[in-house]
Amino acid sequence: MSQKQLKEAFVRNLSGTSVLEVTQGLCFPAFCILCRGLWIIFSQHVCSFSNTWSTRFLMDFVVLIVPLVITLTVLSSFILLENLTVIVWGAWLLYQIYHRRTCYAKVPVQKVFANFLKISLESEYNPAITCYRVINSVFTAIAILAVDFPLFPRRFAKTELYGTGAMDFGVGGFIFGAAMVCPEVRRKSIEESRFNYLRKSLYSVWPLVFLGMGRLVIIKSIGYQEHSTEYGIHWNFFFTIIVVRLVTSLLLIIFPLNKSWIVAVSITVVYQLALDYTPLKRILLYGTDGSGTRVGFLNANREGIISTLGYVTIHMAGVQTGLYVLKGRAQVRDWIKATCWVFSVAVGFFISLHIVQVNIEAVSRRMANLAFCLWVVASSLMLLSCLLLSGIILSFAQFLIKGSLVPCSWKLIQSPTTHKNHSESLILEAEKNQPSLCLITALNRNQLFFFLLSNITTGLINLTMDTLHTGALWTLVVLSIYMFTNCLVIYVLDLQGKTIKFW
């Protein structure tokens, strides 16, 4: 077999891992972000905190990126232990911050909590959604290269037909994250004529057309390894995003934004019925002739074309979630209620997923069926609830230490029900000492360019080295240098105030 055939075989016929393990893996970076924020607050209070760009970059890289690289490789069998370790570290940091608090130092704990619940948080910015999208981008960047090395567990790779691999969540999670901040959600309504709105939607996808066609031409011209049952012969994820964007733009013109969940449920139920009671599933799996033909555009790209219905469902669910999470809330107590609600809905979706897998069909990314949509939405909501909780805890820590502020977190703003002098000090000193260097902010600013850069460097590494026969130590070195280089480029762009856009 040629090197290309060996690499293609290396990522085929895989069945994934458990839903629980993927969920644990998703929660881990949320806890890392929490500990990173608590450590910043603790360091600012206990010792002089270095605010140079190099120090901040190295800290973010070590606390946010390196743990993910290790989790997806050498410590993949100890995800639960990693979570417990980070939680214990975070609890210790919070304990130290509380006992060193500069505000309400002699006030009973009940009174401290009561005053904190009355504090207001900045409503125009939600760090949980930013962190969600960055986590998905970083995970994807690591996985697309790591999957070609033996050190990367095969159970985390994309599944062939049924199953829940960690990389299976990546594609659905990207759609969900993009939907939460789509123009419709940020604007809350379609304020212009339908024709102009559709025209702008069509114009907004042309960079994706360029990227999708460019990827297709490059892959075919250099003979790069492909997994044809993933999207088809010519299709790729850029084309899926294009179709989803256009279809959902049309749906959001026809249906009210706050009814997006009804549209999502309707589409996925009808799609699952079509898979079960029409020849649609047979066509998707075996082609129109039933023998796996790839003749004709539909047969050649049947997986990518048909599965877009599932991704449309996920997008509409993301729109509904974005409307709820980005809704302005007056006080911390309101955000606690919202976090509990998101967590409760996530649990409800996991229960529904179990019922569907037992009685209807297992999760299939290849088909993007009902179970897949439920799994992606449930996992996304669970991650989002962890990030919301982390944001609230960080806000509490900032509330305790006067003048502290964590980049990419909520700002505490004055509340009329809180002690006036303390509220003012929270605002003035925090703004005066506000750190401006943050890897999360940098990655969020240039997410598309980071994804493209990761794809290009992944291709270059695969073309220049034999990844299939690389040892564990060298794999970690390559992955670390790869992520360090990509993150550093994005970080420097952010320092210079540059956003790379192609439109």
Curated annotation (Swiss-Prot):
EC number(s) recorded for this UniProt protein: 2.3.-.-
Q: Which InterPro entries match?
A: PIGW/GWT1
Among Pfam families, the record links this protein to: GWT1
Q: Could you cite one Gene Ontology molecular function of this protein?
A: glucosaminyl-phosphatidylinositol O-acyltransferase activity
The biological pathway it contributes to is:
Glycolipid biosynthesis; glycosylphosphatidylinositol-anchor biosynthesis
The yes or no answer to whether the keyword Transferase is present is yes
Protein purpose: Acyltransferase that catalyzes the acyl transfer from an acyl-CoA at the 2-OH position of the inositol ring of glucosaminyl phosphatidylinositol (GlcN-PI) to generate GlcN-(acyl)PI and participates in the fourth step of GPI-anchor biosynthesi. Required for the transport of GPI-anchored proteins to the plasma membrane. Acetylation during GPI-anchor biosynthesis is not essential for the subsequent mannosylation and is usually removed soon after the attachment of GPIs to proteins.
The record's comment on protein family reads: Belongs to the PIGW family.
Descriptive protein name: Glucosaminyl-phosphatidylinositol-acyltransferase PIGW
Species name: Mus musculus
Organism phylogeny: Eukaryota, Metazoa, Chordata, Craniata, Vertebrata
